Design a protein with these regions (language model features):
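Solvent-exposed edge beta-strands and adjacent loop segments
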Residues: 1-67, 104-118
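Homeobox/homeodomain signature
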Residues: 4, 60, 86-88, 126
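Generic "edge-of-domain/loop-turn" microfeature
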Residues: 21, 75-77, 93-95, 105, ...
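Oligomerization/assembly interface segments of phage tail-like spikes and tubes
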Residues: 54-76, 120-134
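Short, acidic/charged, Gly/Pro-enriched secondary-structure junctions
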Residues: 71-101
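Mixed-charge, glycine-accented linear interaction segment located at domain edges/termini
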Residues: 103-141
């Protein structure tokens, strides 16, 4: 099994979109190295601390699996009852989408932080995981 890891150098912007409003076959477009257009409203998510975004690719006998992970802290509560995809813009200006119109959808883990007495901010800690044949696909906003 061969494993590679892509880590974004820094996250400048995070936004969410409803999966149902995305174009079809994002994973296949990503494999073909075609940037995906995001033709719907992107809801910006304010964040604090340092978000992280990475994608681990495993190739095992011709089977490819990407696992993208996005971690960030925000004051905003996202609409968790809907299937959401995330548009991440790195500090180099390149944008990527995590998620697709079709299953599997990203899994959102939410932790509530009440902050510390020493001044750490209170808020919501999100960990988004998306496992597909291609995740963290370049996109146009």
């Amino acid at each position: 099994m061969r494993t590679t890891k892509q880590i974004l150098p820094g996250v400048k912007e995070i936004g969410w979109v409803r999966c149902e409003h995305l174009v079809n076959d994002i994973a296949l477009r990503g494999i073909a190295m075609m940037p995906v257009p995001v033709l719907t409203e992107i809801h910006n998510v304010p964040f604090f601390d340092e978000p992280t975004c990475e994608c681990v690719t495993e190739n095992d006998g011709g089977n490819r699996t990407d696992t993208a992970k996005l971690k960030f802290a925000s004051e905003d509560l996202l609409p968790l009852k809907e299937h959401l995809a995330f548009v991440v813009t790195a500090i180099d200006g390149n944008s990527y989408i995590i998620g697709a119109r079709e299953t599997p959808f990203p899994v959102i883990k939410l932790t509530i932080s009440f902050g510390d007495a020493d001044g750490d901010a209170a808020g919501f800690i999100y960990e988004i995981t998306h496992k597909a044949i291609k995740s963290l696909v370049p996109c146009h906003k």
